[in-house]
Amino acid sequence: GMMNTHFVNCCGLDADGHETTARDVAYMSRELINKYPEIHNYSTIWMDTITHSTRRGNSEFGLTNTNKLIKQYEWATGLKTGSTSLAGFCLSATANKNDIELIAVVMHAPNGKERVADCISLLNYGYGIVSRYEDVNPRKYLKFA
């Protein structure tokens, strides 16, 4: 689990004692996508329009995804960007290529472009060294009476 993380707030802003590691962010991301795979239905949206309704009427405003990886990496499926003065530019990136799902985490990048470039490098490296394994001789389990 997340052995090197201590959150002191839920918003992710800098605070004394608020700390995590790239590995722990990857664990947290894995849990999120495993338990709630529908998150990709939202994290892959590039732009959308929201209608805000009040007694005075309706108003629309546009939202653009802060995760530029969605537009720059063919297999990107999400997931979460963030930046603070102490953490720098961070990204927990998920991708799915040939039914292989990978997570890449970049922390403390100097800017948004480099966090995306670093995630692309990590994902490309991962896809270059992994392949899907299919067990041609699945284990036969014995049943004991």
Kindly label every feature range from the protein language model.
Residues 2-6, 10-145:
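Domain-terminus/edge residues, biased toward the C-terminal soluble/receptor-binding domains
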